[in-house]
Design a protein with these regions (language model features):
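Membrane-interfacial terminal anchoring regions of lipid-handling membrane enzymes
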Residues: 1-27, 33, 37, 60-62, ...
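Catalytic core of membrane glycerolipid acyltransferases/transacylases, capturing the structured
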Residues: 18-37, 49-50, 57, 63-121
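N-terminal nucleotide/polyanion-binding subdomain common to many enzyme families
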Residues: 38-46
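A generic structural signal for well-ordered alpha-helical segments
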Residues: 46-47, 108, 134, 166
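Short gly/ser/thr-rich secondary-structure transition/capping motifs
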Residues: 48-57, 124-125, 181-183
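Short amphipathic alpha-helix with an adjacent loop that forms part of the alpha/beta core around
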Residues: 58-62, 130-133
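Non-catalytic C-terminal accessory region of glycerolipid acyltransferases
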Residues: 125-243
């Protein structure tokens, strides 16, 4: 709990000190890079300070150009690991409530993150459509296809929004697998444990080979690839090699 308190206090101070001038700079220059990277590097620094090590593999598999990154979601601890591992500025579909955070919410907006209300179907569809248009215009995205954090660390069923985006925009999907984050911080826990999180980029998948009518096939293919890339205790029950 002390580690969580440390991050909460010092990250809040960091946001208060660094956030306002960067927000003003972004509003004037229309360049979201500084506010984005200040946020990513700041969170990564505090995560490391409390004893969480992050290892990254497979960077050479990331294709040039716009792509859609998809990752499994097991814990609040995997978000900084996954975002920090991606070596380019990306946008994210974030739940609407996060945009209400002071300073951070404004930074999310200026970084072109898109708010989504998962509880309202029409609103969620509109958010996916907006993100798809951003993909088409050259903005890479990160999506958690499970839609929410896994309760036990195992890969869950996927929603179809990510593959619909990739097929419609004609961009490759880059699967990412994150292991160990659920042991660092559980889904319903505020306690941060020291440990290691491994983030691995898998081989990209060419979504342009699929039509929208084949979205279920692509969705299942991406899930199978990610399940195979996870350690046995994070694979879905019944999947080959699952513990």
């Amino acid at each position: 709990m002390l580690r969580t308190l440390f991050i909460g206090v010092f990250l809040s101070l960091y946001i208060l000190l660094v956030g306002p001038p960067l927000l003003v700079y972004t509003l004037i220059t229309k360049n979201p890079d500084p506010v984005y990277w200040a946020g990513v590097k700041g969170v990564m620094f505090f995560v490391r300070v409390v004893g969480v090590r992050i290892r990254v593999r497979g960077l050479e598999r990331i294709p040039r150009g716009v792509c859609l990154f998809v990752a499994n979601h097991t814990s609040s601890a995997d978000a900084p690991a996954v975002v920090g591992a991606i070596p380019r500025r990306i946008a994210i579909l974030l739940k609407e409530s996060l945009f209400k955070w002071p300073i951070a919410g404004q930074a999310f907006t200026l970084a072109h993150f898109i708010r989504v209300n998962r509880g309202v179907r029409d609103s969620a569809i509109a958010s996916v459509e907006k993100a798809t248009e951003a993909l088409k215009s050259g903005q890479s995205f990160l999506i958690y296809p499970e839609g929410t954090r896994s309760p036990d660390g195992r890969l869950q069923e996927f929603k179809k929004g990510a593959v619909v985006m990739a097929i419609t925009a004609g961009v490759p999907i880059v699967p990412m697998v994150c292991s160990g984050a659920h042991r660092v911080m559980g889904k319903r826990s505020l306690v941060i444990h020291p440990g290691e999180i491994l983030v691995e980029f898998l081989q990209p998948i060419d979504a342009s080979k699929y039509s929208l009518e084949e979205r279920d096939d692509l969705n299942e293919h991406v899930r199978q690839v990610m399940a195979a890339g996870l350690p046995p205790d994070q694979r879905p029950v019944g999947f080959p090699g699952a513990a």
